């Protein structure tokens, strides 16, 4: 059982390593504008995409040769998620994002992550504006009074 886990990690590393040359980081953090300690964040977690791909095609990703022989098909299928649907963040904001959405955010959370990045940016750009909290909910005719 432990061997499978090891190979699963290796499959993820093999897939990641092959696509890294296609990454393009911006020159500053999308939230704070810092140009130091920049990291690329994938809104669609690579390890989750790899697991999904292997499951859909019923591939045994404990076999390195199978991983390597399917790498280009994986890149082609998920090029948008791997290369384009990403954001450059400073290390601080990248860590904050992962505190909110966990180390391996589920694939369905991509749009929520994008909204979170925008919200953090808005907070920095407009520190005086506070999020309005609805304190009272009226129902029936009371809404019109």
From Swiss-Prot:
The keyword Hydrolase is annotated on this UniProt entry: yes
Region (Disordered): 126-145
Residues spanning the membrane: none
Induction: Expressed in the late phase of the viral replicative cycle.
Enzyme class: hydrolase
GO molecular function annotation: DNA binding; endonuclease activity
UniProt-listed Enzyme Commission number(s): 3.1.21.-
Coiled coil stretches, renumbered: none
Keyword annotations of the record: DNA-binding, Endonuclease, Hydrolase, Late protein, Nuclease
Keyword Nuclease carried by entry: yes
Role, per record: Endonuclease responsible for the single-chain interruptions (nicks) located at specific positions in the minus strand of the viral genome.
Protein name: Nicking endonuclease
Organism: Escherichia phage T5
